[in-house]
Amino acid sequence: MFTGSIVALITPMDSKGSIDRMGLKKLVDYHVDNGTSAIVSVGTTGEMSGLTHSEHVDVVMWTIEFSDGRLPVIAGTGSNSTSEAILLTNQFNDSAVSACLSVTPYYNRPSQEGLFQHFRAIAESTNLPQILYNVPIRTGCDLLPITVGRLSTIKNIVGIKEATGNLNRVNQLKRLVNEDFILLSGDDISAVDFMRLGGHGVISVTANVAPKDMSTLCSFVQKNDFKSAYDINNRLIPVHQSLFFDSNPIPVKWACKELGLISYDTLRLPMTSISKEHSVLIRKALEDADLL
């Protein structure tokens, strides 16, 4: 089961926008050393929309190589085309990928029946465990709990990253899925509350800059020490907030550069560099949280 602090890992690039392979190794080692429980490779934070198909596959495979069995690797494999999602998922059938994270189709705005058939078709094309990913603010469609319940009956659909920030979803989902179905928060600010209600962990943007804190926070939740978990979360709230002052991953890549975790905060168009105003606010949040 995937639990605890799972980092939604950034994809490091050099000054010209090429993938920084050794920079990726440094990040993987950093997360191994700081208690992260698993890595999501090439999800939203990893700029899945900005990489070519071959780059996407390369980054996931390099992440597996550098992890070397020390951390599970979850591959981002979603697409708004069902056939493309199947193609990308099947690239990892013979790899050491632990699971795939499949985002709801963006732009198309499918019906709930369309979403059901989309994810069923992907799951039936592979033996790899599938984690659903619901993030309506980015995709324009909402995978409702009733549809998740239907999908949870498919053997290799094993969980969901629920990123609405709507805590009512936890109880709704728990009533509709089996007890082994994995519930992961995709919203750092509300993650402690999500887990307190029965969630199993968080796929975290903040873990890029505060992996030890996020890991410790999750450990406290697992021990039912919610006071200690909230103490950490309250210190990190300005960081959680600041990492979304601009579209993800613009702020978190800048923050990682400031922390010396990557050499450049290079992004690919249409993403552009962070504004001076926001960089000042992010720096203050990092300093106030004793991260910088």
From Swiss-Prot:
Active site: 133, 161
SMART domains xrefs: DHDPS
Domain of life of the source: Bacteria
Keywords annotated in UniProt: Amino-acid biosynthesis, Cytoplasm, Diaminopimelate biosynthesis, Lyase, Lysine biosynthesis, Schiff base
Reactions mediated catalytically: L-aspartate 4-semialdehyde + pyruvate = (2S,4S)-4-hydroxy-2,3,4,5-tetrahydrodipicolinate + H2O + H(+)
Signal peptide: none
Record-listed E.C. numbers: 4.3.3.7
Ranges that cross the membrane: none
Major subcellular location class: cytoplasm
InterPro entries reported in the protein's UniProt record: Aldolase_TIM, DapA, DapA-like, Schiff_base-form_aldolases_AS
Gene Ontology MF, one: 4-hydroxy-tetrahydrodipicolinate synthase activity
Binding site for pyruvate: 45, 203
UniProt xrefs under Gene3D superfamilies: Aldolase class I (3.20.20.70)
Gene Ontology biological-process entries: diaminopimelate biosynthetic process; lysine biosynthetic process via diaminopimelate
GO cellular component, one term: cytosol
Site residues, Part of a proton relay during catalysis: 44, 107
Subcellular location, record wording: Cytoplasm
CDD domains reported for this sequence: DHDPS (cd00950)
Role of this protein: Catalyzes the condensation of (S)-aspartate-beta-semialdehyde [(S)-ASA] and pyruvate to 4-hydroxy-tetrahydrodipicolinate (HTPA).
Quaternary assembly: Homotetramer; dimer of dimers.
Family: Belongs to the DapA family.
Protein name as it appears in the record: 4-hydroxy-tetrahydrodipicolinate synthase
Organism, scientific name: Blochmanniella floridana
Record lineage: Bacteria, Pseudomonadati, Pseudomonadota, Gammaproteobacteria, Enterobacterales
